[in-house]
């Protein structure tokens, strides 16, 4: 984790273009999502938007603690390759399945989702939300990153989630803002 934190810090200060940066969550958000994931009910764990795998490492720690596995989706080939290296180096490949491709190709009809962490291209959040929520188990948790710093782009999805009668939802001001939803 320390190496990815170092690279992320460097990329943010040296002007690396946004699409080439690792774009990972800060450590306190990693701890937060791992804590919530470990408390999720029985069912599948998924992550949408792997990047280099930093958030997945936090979730892998939770997987190990409670005997689960996670499937993570990354659409960009170079980031999927980097994530595979990250998982191998960290020794978590046994609890992480990386799928290179668009999560939206896999999510329709997906059932038994107990935990979902969403940190992908912001324009896709609404479609991902609509694909994930119907497949969530009661008590299932959906966390969407960047709910505060990308609020303008995410506002339609945020409004939908905060008013969705199937869920209890709120925005937690940690990191760049986390939308946390729990299925009723």
At which residue positions do the language-model features occur?
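A short alpha-helical cap/connector motif
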Residues: 1-115, 122-143, 147-184
């Amino acid at each position: 984790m320390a190496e990815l934190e170092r690279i992320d810090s460097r990329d943010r200060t040296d002007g690396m273009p946004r699409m080439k940066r690792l774009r990972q969550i800060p450590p306190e958000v990693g701890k937060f999502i791992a804590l919530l994931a470990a408390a999720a009910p029985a069912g599948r764990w998924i992550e949408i938007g792997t990047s280099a795998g930093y958030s997945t490492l936090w979730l892998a720690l939770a997987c190990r603690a409670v005997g689960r596995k996670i499937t993570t989706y990354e659409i960009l080939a170079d980031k999927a390759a980097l994530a595979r290296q990250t998982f191998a180096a960290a020794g978590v490949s046994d609890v992480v399945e990386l799928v290179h491709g668009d999560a939206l190709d896999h999510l329709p009809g997906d059932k038994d989702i107990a935990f979902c962490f969403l940190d992908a291209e912001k324009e896709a959040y609404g479609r991902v939300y609509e694909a994930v929520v119907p497949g969530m188990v009661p008590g299932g948790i959906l966390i969407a990153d960047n709910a505060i710093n990308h609020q303008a782009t995410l506002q339609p999805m945020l409004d939908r989630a905060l008013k969705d009668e199937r869920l209890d939802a709120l925005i937690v001001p940690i990191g760049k803002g986390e939308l946390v939803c729990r299925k009723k």
